[in-house]
Curated annotation (Swiss-Prot):
Protein origin, superkingdom: Bacteria
EC number annotated for this UniProt entry: 6.3.5.7
Chain ranges passing through the membrane: none
Subunit structure comment from the entry: Heterotrimer of A, B and C subunits.
Encoding gene (name): gatA
Protein name: Glutamyl-tRNA(Gln) amidotransferase subunit A
Organism field: Limosilactobacillus fermentum (strain NBRC 3956 / LMG 18251) (Lactobacillus fermentum)
Gene Ontology CC: glutamyl-tRNA(Gln) amidotransferase complex
Catalytic residues identified in the record: K77 (charge relay system), S152 (charge relay system), S176 (acyl-ester intermediate)
Database matches in SUPFAM superfamilies: Amidase signature (AS) enzymes
Single annotated GO MF: ATP binding
Amino acid sequence: MTFYGKDISGLHADLVAKKVSATELTKAAFDRIKATDDQVGAFLALNEEAALKQAAELDQAGIAEDQLLAGIPLAVKDNIVTKGLTTTAASKILENFKPVYDATVVEKLNAAGVINVGKVNLDEFAMGSSTENSAFKTTKNPWDLTRVPGGSSGGSAAAVAAGDVLGALGSDTGGSIRIPASFTGTVGMKPTYGRVSRWGLIAFGSSFDQIGWLTQSVKDNAILMSAIAGKDDRDMTSANQPVPDFAAGLNDQADIKGMKIAVPREYMEGLDDDVQEVIEASLKHLESLGATIDEVSLPHTKYGVPAYYILASSEASSNLQRFDGIRYGFRADDVKNLEDVYVKTRSQGFGDEVKLRIMLGTFSLSAGFYDAYFNKAAKVRRLIAQDFDDVLKDHDLIVGPTGTSTAFKIGAEIADPKQMYFNDVLTVTLNMAGLPGMSIPAGFSKDNGMPIGLQMIGKRFDEATIYKAGYVFEQTTDFHKQTPELG
């Protein structure tokens, strides 16, 4: 059994009616993982014994009508802490690290009866766009095993695209949910900054990071988002905003007639031909469904990537100071003194990309360069946020491509950090402004057959409008129904 064509509501109905058991679903997930993961490499750790025990307990107690997520197998990105289950952030410096507590989002899922089947791969400390920066393995794209799944939540996207699970938690600092969703033909939502607690997320850029979902369908994404959203007193950046039922209204009556959609001209520049063709067809389809399409400008988009990498790397250089070999994690051998512990532990424990970003961030924050780099980047961030506000005053959504290309070949860009960074040109600005955005399947390349994603951006705390538009688009196309051919 795969989870292709399945959905949370349907599986829940079967669980309540005892047409299927939580144990059967959980075993099916592990059978599928074992059948595909030698090829794909999505998982870093399996939680099989604990998951089957939890499933048996749910079956014994029975699953009630109001326990929508009970018995549903899902996966967790390995930079989100899980009590007693290794959490490595795909870094040697945290190899074999077992946290003593659960992240808030994991607590909420546990309380809802979700079955965590395991932890999935990522770029080390979520720094990357291809999942090639993991210290442990390179995850492959289920649509073409010679190509990347995107990053940094590549393991999450690959697990969903491979039919291992219906959904997987990811995190998005500059596109790390949306780019993998686009590359793998899945649905990826980065919610508004503050919508979901970051407590228990291993920090990369604290003012950029946000936890979200990768799923096979828009409705499942909406259901799961409602389950993890909300204020958390342990995270001072989480917002005290009411959490709607995001899936309410996602039915046959949903429509987008009269919805005002903005398309930034900057987002339609420099696209591969196949991406441009798919996005233009998607915009025409939205128009045929009753939306109005306006061309607009987000003039500071071109400054987004350099400003983002200065700011996010500066935050990373601070956040990663805690990994020093003293309290937990990897510690180098053959050290002579305390300074030696720090230097050798960090030199041996961090990968090249992490070291590069620490150095960039430290340089940007150093005396004599702070004003020239960090302060200027912070000003650009404010201008980018203002651009979005100006457009969204008169529009319901901003729509465009998620990325400029389809998934690239493994190894094609890893040696050129600058080229890799510019894969994020259409996603980083959203994190700088703290807005919600979702990538949904919009078509396939005629050139290489790879998926192409459409990005929908909304107003702060208005994920509901994004879900509505995404659902209507999804239900009037069949791109989400197509699946890769895996053994």
